């Protein structure tokens, strides 16, 4: 029995190594398969589309803008040699009509090619740093949920029937923010927790149909979503929408410090190697043994994912400490700075009062002692007179 306690963990570790370094390196035939990708204007989606095309995968690349469609198509045409077929389409995942139109387009092409849809990649998403929850209206939450969560739900509802026919794959962009909370990103964290919960439920329901569902949980990567100029504009826009009371509570210095702290943090943490995320996408789509969750990024592997299993109180303590280590300026609302100064002034007054009371106490003690000595002297003289 005692031997089993040592053997079972060892066997589990050996199986983990065997699966990770042997089984996961076997791939299904990807050439000629059809994959639908959302959010191909830039970043992960665009790089994934071009990467799959180089592997002879046929790609339905959904872009939010016509400019994104045109530039991607031009890039594809300039490539020489064997490549997959590119089909570009404009898609707004927040619009059911747009999603339905995309499904009709894809269904038509598949029927013409007598083929099936192998993969759906829910890559479209938005990220915007809004600031404290006091700055966020319900609209900020609704906007984040509508793209990051409901956008994926709409796409799954539309395309899952096509994926079932091929017993294919659904891969969705989550985030470490879907596992762990943080400061100043409540709308984004809320949406990512929600979309990961949806995918976890969908994964169980799709098992009988032979469809596998996978989630990517990357750390911080340098993409257009983290563009400093765009973030400055968002911060200024939301600041302008705040009430006078809220602006006075936080102060203009806080707004400026928040902007600088955000940029400093991103420059330190963000990983420029976005190919890491694209490789995870490809593995989830075509590996014989894909993982249910992928966590690209050193910050995800060594900090955020391990931290997500800690007790909540310890998570809060560590996260608060990490934010204090931010290379940017510290963030303290104006009202707390005033209160701190007021408390400091009161403490100084109390301290000075305590110092000032010492001479007073000494004086009282001296006077009382003098009076006592005077009384004792008078009594002594009185006693001497009586004796005579």
Curated annotation (Swiss-Prot):
Protein's cellular compartments: Membrane
Classification via Pfam families: adh_short
Biological process (GO), any one: steroid metabolic process
Active site: 188 (proton acceptor)
UniProt function note: 3beta-hydroxysteroid dehydrogenase that converts 3beta-hydroxysteroids to 3-ketosteroids, an essential step in the production of dafachronic acids from cholesterol. Catalyzes the dehydrogenation of lathosterol (5alpha-cholest-7-en-3beta-ol) to lathosterone (5alpha-cholest-7-en-3-one), a step required for maximal biosynthesis of Delta(7)-dafachronic acid. Dafachronic acids act as ligands and bind directly to the nuclear hormone receptor (NHR) daf-12, suppressing dauer formation and inducing reproductive growth, they can also regulate C.elegans lifespan.
Gene inactivation effect: Mutants appear normal at 20 degrees Celsius but have Daf-c phenotypes (formation of dauer larvae at low population density in the presence of abundant food) at 27 degrees Celsius.
Reactions mediated catalytically: lathosterol + NAD(+) = 5alpha-cholest-7-en-3-one + NADH + H(+)
InterPro entries: NAD(P)-bd_dom_sf (IPR036291), Sc_DH/Rdtase_CS (IPR020904), SDR_fam (IPR002347)
Family as reported in the entry's similarity comment: Belongs to the short-chain dehydrogenases/reductases (SDR) family.
The protein's annotated pathway: Steroid hormone biosynthesis; dafachronic acid biosynthesis
Keyword Oxidoreductase: yes
Membrane topology label: Multi-pass membrane protein
Tissue specificity note: Strongly expressed in the hypodermis and posterior pharyngeal bulb and in a number of unidentified neurons of the head and tail.
Keywords assigned by UniProt, alphabetized: Cholesterol metabolism, Lipid metabolism, Membrane, Oxidoreductase, Steroid metabolism, Sterol metabolism, Transmembrane, Transmembrane helix
Record-level GO cellular component terms: membrane
Top EC category: oxidoreductase
Gene Ontology MF term list: oxidoreductase activity; steroid dehydrogenase activity
Membrane-spanning ranges: 2-22, 300-320, 346-366
Enzyme Commission number: 1.1.1.-
Descriptive protein name: 3beta-hydroxysteroid dehydrogenase dhs-16
Principal location: membrane
PANTHER family: 3BETA-HYDROXYSTEROID DEHYDROGENASE DHS-16, SHORT-CHAIN DEHYDROGENASE/REDUCTASE FAMILY 9C
